[in-house]
Amino acid sequence: MLNTTSVTEFLLLGVTDIQELQPFLFVVFLTIYFISVTGNGAVLMIVISDPRLHSLMYFFLGNLSYLDICYSTVTLPKMLQNFLSTHKAISFLGCISQLHFFHSLGSTESMLFAVMAFDLSVAICKPLRYTVIMNPQLCTQMAITIWVIGFFHALLHSVMTSRLNFCGSNRIHHFLCDIKPLLKLACGNTELNQWLLSTVTGTIAMGPFFLTLLSYFYIITYLFFKTRSCSMLCKALSTCASHFMVVILFYAPVLFTYIHPALESFMDQDRIVAIMYTVVTPVLNPLIYTLRNKEVKGALGRVIRRL
């Protein structure tokens, strides 16, 4: 991985420039990180250890929990360190590594939401054929595919970014190493990087988002025209609504961040909006997708009683 940079480290400006807020924000984000890791860790442990949850639906939920633990850990520990530090530096290699894992896990989660929406649509609309359509082989192949695509998507960006020439300011207008603020610091031609960011990352975000919307539209259409039970309709719509809320909270900020041009006027908005999909969504996922589920709560109760 070659680069012609004269910069050996970057300075992360953080969430806010107001020094008086740093201790308070440290406590807030530390609490969020603890809840995220604990909640997702509990879900992952239950899905692995309880034989009653060894089904395809919980296979995807286990993937989501593992993703969210990793996703939070890529950004939050460094953010917490910087809240209490006066020198908010990150090495060049550390910056590129954070960029790679951030985009690898983020794009994988984006595609996983689409897979989970499709899984839910099959479970609701074709329950008798669910085990035939969503067979273990297909689910394993889908999971491996999205992880591999996410890895190579991030590898493309990390390699291309590492080869840029950084000869001026090393102050990143963000709380993490992301592509857009790094491109603002590059001295050379970044047109190819900008095109890859808009085209490839835009496709990775827009494609799964469209497929997710399509799955939920199909579910709602099916429920209104095929379901005669009001209780079943209300329960299914409640499940879809809560899932869809998490999906919107993830996709909307991502699309806002990576679709609009990299202008100086958007930098402050970008780092605030990024909190939604880097910090908030990983906390909500275990609450919305699993801990509201009766089978998961039952499994959690059995684990607690055994302790």
Swiss-Prot record:
Spans within the Extracellular topological domain = 1-23, 74-97, 159-195, 258-270
Q: Which CDD domains match?
A: 7tmA_OR12D-like
Annotated Gene Ontology cellular component terms: membrane; plasma membrane
Q: Where are the transmembrane segments?
A: 24-44, 53-73, 98-118, 138-158, 196-215, 237-257, 271-291
Q: Which GO terms describe its molecular function?
A: G protein-coupled receptor activity; odorant binding; olfactory receptor activity
Q: Which GO terms describe its biological process?
A: detection of chemical stimulus involved in sensory perception of smell
Is Disulfide bond included in the keywords of this UniProt record? yes
Glycosylated at which positions? N3
Name of one Pfam family that matches: 7tm_4
- PROSITE patterns found in the cross-reference section: G_PROTEIN_RECEP_F1_2 (PS50262)
Q: Does the keyword DNA-binding apply?
A: no
Membrane disposition: Multi-pass membrane protein
The source's domain of life comes to Eukaryota
Cystine links in this protein are C95-C187
Q: Give the Cytoplasmic membrane side ranges.
A: 45-52, 119-137, 216-236, 292-307
Q: Where does the protein principally reside?
A: membrane
Q: Which UniProt keywords apply?
A: Cell membrane, Disulfide bond, G-protein coupled receptor, Glycoprotein, Membrane, Olfaction, Receptor, Sensory transduction, Transducer, Transmembrane, Transmembrane helix
Where does it localize? Answer: Cell membrane
Classification via InterPro entries: GPCR_Rhodpsn, GPCR_Rhodpsn_7TM, Olfact_rcpt, Olfactory_GPCR
The entry's function note states: Odorant receptor.
Which family does the record assign?
A: Belongs to the G-protein coupled receptor 1 family.
Full protein name: Olfactory receptor 12D2
Q: What is the lineage of its organism?
A: Eukaryota, Metazoa, Chordata, Craniata, Vertebrata
